[in-house]
A protein has these predicted regions:
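Extreme N-terminal "head/tail" segments of very large remodeling/mechanoenzyme assemblies
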Residues: 1-57
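Phosphate/anion-contacting hairpin/loop surfaces
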Residues: 15, 41-262
Length: 262
């Protein structure tokens, strides 16, 4: 499955105890969309900002690096090597992660830099910010005429994407559960209803909710009785509590002995 915002939150919850305080010894860029941070303690943090599988994870895979490091890699080495990761934050319930790194420059002055991963499909990006959130550089530069008000260029101040007008399981759990209970129009599918109205809900999660409520992944709200709508609301309530409390149960789907989804 794609790394949706809820799954990303779970991954970060697992990574923080291992990464907070870790010293960055090396920075590598084995591919255009990939950065690998080699951390003290023999940890390798892969940050993939590609359009197909954007993600962040620990890895044991040794990737071949180009003979000449790309410009972004050299910039990251200049600002991050020798620094320590002090914070890892997820913006709202979005697929945006900020790694805060405290380091000492050539003059012996302490400062912070931020490495921001926007794991947003074809719009995925990786940005290096200074302590004032000014962009030092990014993996994909975006001009004004392409993105409208949100350009991503060196020298500009970084801005988060415009918030989506959706309910969050974290900031408004009661409203989210009540909306799930009321539901949408009779001909609207549960999957589409959930995708259009809730932050962090991926198509796979939406179909799972629909199946648990109506025993079909493409069930429409008009086909749900009161008990099934209450089941949907309860599923939302349980999920909201689990996410807020960081209570996760990772699952891997195997087919013929090979992992095919998670």
């Amino acid at each position: 499955m794609p790394l949706d915002a809820i799954c990303l939150r779970a991954v970060l919850h697992e990574l923080r105890p291992q990464l907070i305080g870790a010293r960055i010894d090396k920075v590598q860029q084995p591919a255009r969309d990939q950065i690998v941070l080699l951390l003290r303690g023999n940890l390798r943090l892969l940050i993939n900002a590609g359009p197909n599988q954007p993600r962040v994870q620990l890895t044991e895979v040794l990737r071949e690096n180009p003979a000449e490091p790309p410009m972004l890699c050299m910039l990251l080495r200049k600002h991050l090597v020798g620094g320590r990761i002090t914070e890892i934050e997820q913006s709202r319930l979005e697929r945006i992660v900020t790694f805060t790194v405290r380091s000492v420059n050539e003059l012996g002055e302490s400062g912070t830099k931020k490495l921001v991963l926007e794991a947003m499909g074809r719009r995925s990006n990786l940005l290096l910010l200074d302590e004032d959130d000014r962009i030092l550089d990014c993996m994909r530069r975006v001009e004004f005429e392409v993105s409208g008000a949100r350009a991503l260029l060196p020298g500009l101040y970084y801005q988060l994407p415009t918030p989506l007008d959706k309910l969050s399981l974290l900031t408004d759990p009661e409203g989210a559960v009540e909306l799930a209970r009321r539901g949408g129009g009779a001909e609207e599918t549960v999957e589409r209803f959930l995708l259009d109205r809730y932050l962090g809900v991926s198509p796979l999660i939406a179909r799972e909710f629909a199946f648990r409520a109506g025993h079909e992944t493409d069930v429409r709200f008009g086909a749900l009785n009161d008990a099934q709508r209450e089941t949907l609301a309860q599923e939302f309530s349980d999920t909201s509590n689990a996410v807020k409390e960081d209570n996760y149960t990772p699952v891997i789907l195997y087919r013929d002995g090979k992992p095919v989804d998670f």
